[in-house]
Amino acid sequence: MKKLLILPLALFLLVQSGWAQTPKWVEKAKRAVFSVVTYDKNDKILNTGNGFFVSEDGLALSDYSLFKGAERAVIITAEGKQMPVSLILGADDMYDVIKFRVAITEKKVPALTVANTAPAVGADAWMLPYSTQKSIACVSGKVKEVSKIAGEYHYYTLSMQMKDKMVSCPVMNVEGQVFGISQKSS
């Protein structure tokens, strides 16, 4: 009888500890992550990927390769709302990142706060994937390496298992602030 009670109790504690590892800020932050769909000049889908808002007035980030050769682009929020990309503000082919403005259909959109300081090697990090589901499984890991690029910017190497569909998702610190954008490993 004791063996039968120990197994369910151990499983319950294991599940509880897994839930406890998901930071409290995830539920609110996941609403800032969206899907990106780009179209060619014939209005055929060119690419799909992810992105996220960094300001409540529609400023967003994603990977540049999604937009390469695109005639137009739209974003689709976790709630299923579609909004057009109205303006490209900057792009970097080398680091595969693009900054753009979305023509938002509301007064404001959920946005992530950008971290003011770079996380140190060994710091906890979470990657927040796009999800239309109520539950979300963020991926946790650690900062393995921090390199400075172009003087003031940082490039991070993380110990984190990432799937292909997780490219261009925000990488967050323990306070729920975004400090990076996930990219394919080279």
Q: Which residues are covered by each model-predicted region?
A:
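N-terminal activation segment of mature serine protease catalytic domains
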Residues: W19-D63, R72, V97
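Active-site region of chymotrypsin-like
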Residues: A29-T38, A103-A111, S135-S186
